[in-house]
Amino acid sequence: MILGTGIDLLKISRVKKVHDKYGELFEKKILSEDEIKKKTKISLTANKLAKFFATKEAFVKALGSGFTKNISFKDISLKNKLNGKPYIILSDRVQKYLYKKTPRGYKPIINISISDEKDYVVSNVINSFLKK
């Protein structure tokens, strides 16, 4: 059972322009606390920032909320498994909101696909439910 799908397409140069202008302020707006802590371990290129931004946008679209109901970029952490597959960690508040939308006897599943080609990043998120 599918709750919703979300997709976001972003031109990397737009993110670079904003990041060049606002730097750390921009990072603090779109990155979770965990992502900010780990940024010293990874190189935050415009491409990576665009992937964070697009995936979080796609997730809230799939959730059906957008960035409302007190949901912000900081409530969503993008991570990768050892094999590179992306996944999301949600703040307690967003997790509770997702579980409220989950039918009894089901568990929420978040599927993510991120791709980039030259000047663009695209992220697709499908929020669905699986019977327990």
Report the location of each language-model feature.
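Core catalytic alpha/beta fold that binds nucleotide/phospho-ligands
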Residues: 1-132
